[in-house]
């Protein structure tokens, strides 16, 4: 019995292969039903047998016994073809001899194992009693593998594929999330049978299985600093607060800018009258103008005398009275001249008519005909010297022609030359850009001159009144004396004229 169990445990190394291939997990037993049919030629010995002899005979004739009494071998599935022996690589050796903690059982390897455990159930057509002796060699064993429902978890095989068993120990710790490395799965079938003795620490494997699950905990710990990054993000939000603080002095800069703008305000106030007369002039030049204006208290004096004094002072000051020139009376004098110039072509018409020479008058002296024909118009009273000069110039070519040159055959009429009227010179008011200072100085000068003229007129009136008062007073005194003289007595030879002269002398 003990030998049979030992041999059954050893088998052909299938269990050891299963342990080595499955990472220490025993393969599930495959149930096989065996029906035993005793042959009709089976001799049944009626010899009483002692209790236990039937079991001894069965064990001795069984193919699993030590003496191999029976020759009948059970029908077993053909073993899988053995792979050619290859020199194991370093990765295979590491995956084989590494600690079982990094290896998980693979159901694929369990399915690929050529051999598995069998549980034989004997069914006899006749009840076997202690009186019946059955020989195993006379039995016909029919092996019918039965697929139980426990063998159906094959679809769960892909779930157990993430096996990092091929990767070395150091690399597996980093490559744990790589479940796509089932390349070295068929290799565990080459493991020798001696590994079975080393499979004793296999019960520790299920305990160590949850350890790889602890590795993701480290990954979670690494993911914990990620929420710390957004915690540092609000810190730059405080930076805009500093920027706002820096932006506060910015309005102060524009406050300093308008300060230089206040200086042009005075210029703008001065520039308001500039649209009227935009010419700029230096301010210090106005001062001598005022001095010159004060030097003109005598408008009645000849103007030529003070002019040379004003010229060296300032030429611009002299240009100020120019606007007063158009106000003078010479302008209406120019108007009639233009009207007379338009009437000039009228006397020229009779001058061109005497040029016609008739045949009947050829024998007459040409000079007389010319003198008779040329009718010199009487100068108009409105003609000026310039108009008379132009009329004389028009008559000069007619008088200069010799008398013998006149044609004798046919009269030749020359086209009358129309002289163009002299262009009417229209006096265009010159617009000058006068600076504000000069304008103000001129205004003040005009006002001062007007005041001075008023004062002079007032002085003249006062003087006249005084003089008239004196004359009137003298006349009154003379009259009073005459009256007093007539009242006292006649003057005799004294006449009134003498009294008047006496009064005047007094």
From Swiss-Prot:
Signal peptide start and end residues: none
Acidic repeat 8. repeat intervals: 342-355
Compartments where located: Magnetosome
Ranges of Gly residues composition bias in the record: 13-25
Positions annotated as Acidic repeat repeat: 150-173, 174-197, 198-221, 222-245, 246-269, 270-293, 294-317, 318-341
Mutant lacking the gene: phenotype: Single gene deletion, no effect on magnetic response or MamK filaments, gaps form in the magnetosome chain. A double mamJ/limJ deletion has wild-type magnetic response, but forms large gaps in the magnetosome chains reminiscent of the mamK deletion. MamK forms bundles in these gaps, but the MamK filaments are no longer dynamic. Deletion of genes mamH to mamV (amb0961 to amb0978) gives cells with no magnetosomes and no magnetic response.
One GO BP annotation of this record: magnetosome assembly
Biased composition (Basic and acidic residues): 1-12
Induction: Part of the probable 18 gene mamAB operon.
Keywords carried by this UniProt record: Biomineralization, Magnetosome, Repeat
Record-level GO cellular component terms: magnetosome
Region (Disordered): 1-36, 63-93, 405-424
NCBIfam families: MamJ (NF040987)
Annotated family: Belongs to the magnetosome MamJ protein family.
Subunit text: Forms homooligomers. Interacts with MamK.
Domain notes: The center of the protein encodes 8.6 repetitions of a Glu-rich sequence.
Additional remark text: This bacteria makes up to 20 cubo-octahedral magnetosomes of about 45 nm in diameter which contain membrane-bound crystals of magnetite (Fe(3)O(4)).
Protein function: Regulates the dynamic behavior of MamK filaments; paralog LimJ also promotes MamK turnover. At least one other protein besides MamJ and LimJ is required for MamK turnover. May connect magnetosomes to MamK filaments. Moves from the cell poles towards midcell; movement does not depend on the treadmilling ability of MamK, suggesting MamJ associates and disassociates continuously from the MamK filament.
Protein name: Magnetosome-associated protein MamJ
Organism: Paramagnetospirillum magneticum (strain ATCC 700264 / AMB-1) (Magnetospirillum magneticum)
């Amino acid at each position: 019995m003990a030998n049979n169990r030992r041999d059954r445990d050893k088998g052909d190394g299938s269990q050891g292969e299963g342990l080595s291939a499955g990472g220490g997990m025993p393969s599930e037993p495959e149930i096989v039903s065996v029906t035993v049919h005793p042959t009709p030629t089976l001799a049944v010995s009626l010899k009483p047998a002692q209790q236990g002899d039937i079991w001894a005979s069965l064990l001795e004739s069984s193919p699993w016994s030590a003496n191999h009494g029976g020759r009948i071998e059970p029908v077993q599935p053909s073993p899988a073809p053995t792979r050619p022996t290859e020199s194991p690589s370093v990765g295979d050796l590491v995956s084989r001899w590494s600690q079982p903690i990094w290896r998980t059982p693979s159901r694929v390897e369990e399915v690929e194992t050529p051999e598995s455990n069998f549980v034989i159930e004997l069914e006899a057509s006749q009840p076997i009693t202690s009186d019946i002796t059955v020989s195993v060699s006379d039995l016909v064993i029919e092996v019918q593998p039965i697929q139980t429902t426990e063998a159906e978890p094959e679809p769960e095989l892909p779930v157990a594929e993430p096996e990092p068993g091929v990767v070395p120990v150091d690399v597996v710790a980093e490559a744990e999330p790589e479940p796509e490395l089932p390349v070295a799965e068929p290799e565990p079938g080459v493991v020798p049978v001696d590994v079975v003795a080393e499979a004793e620490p296999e019960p520790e494997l299920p305990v160590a299985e949850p350890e790889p699950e602890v590795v993701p905990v480290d990954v979670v710990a690494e993911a914990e600093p990620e929420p710390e990054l957004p915690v540092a993000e609000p810190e730059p939000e405080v930076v805009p607060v500093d920027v706002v603080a820096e932006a506060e002095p910015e309005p102060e800069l524009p406050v300093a800018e308008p300060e230089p703008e206040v200086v042009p305000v005075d210029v703008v106030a001065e520039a308001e009258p500039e649209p009227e007369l935009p010419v700029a002039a230096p301010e210090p030049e106005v001062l001598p103008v005022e001095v010159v204006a004060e030097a003109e208290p005598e408008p009645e004096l000849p103007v030529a005398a003070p002019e040379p004094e004003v010229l060296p002072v300032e030429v611009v000051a002299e240009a100020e009275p120019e606007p007063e020139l158009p106000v003078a009376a010479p302008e209406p004098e120019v108007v009639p001249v233009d009207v007379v110039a338009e009437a000039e072509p009228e006397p020229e018409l009779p001058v061109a008519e005497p040029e016609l020479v008739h045949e009947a008058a050829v024998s007459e002296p040409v000079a007389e005909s010319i003198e008779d024909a040329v009718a010199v118009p009487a100068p108009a009273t409105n003609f000026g010297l310039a108009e008379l000069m132009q009329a004389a110039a028009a008559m000069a070519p007619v008088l200069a022609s010799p008398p013998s040159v006149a044609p004798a055959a046919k009269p030749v009429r020359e086209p009358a030359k129309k002289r163009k009227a002299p262009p009417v010179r229209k006096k265009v008011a010159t617009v000058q850009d006068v600076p504000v200072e000069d304008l103000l100085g001129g205004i003040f000068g005009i006002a001062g001159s007007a005041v001075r003229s008023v004062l002079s007129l007032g002085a003249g009136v006062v003087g006249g009144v005084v003089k008239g008062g004196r004359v009137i007073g003298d006349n009154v005194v003379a009259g009073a004396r005459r009256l007093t003289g007539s009242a006292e007595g006649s003057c005799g030879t004294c006449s009134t004229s003498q009294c008047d002269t006496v009064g005047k002398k007094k």
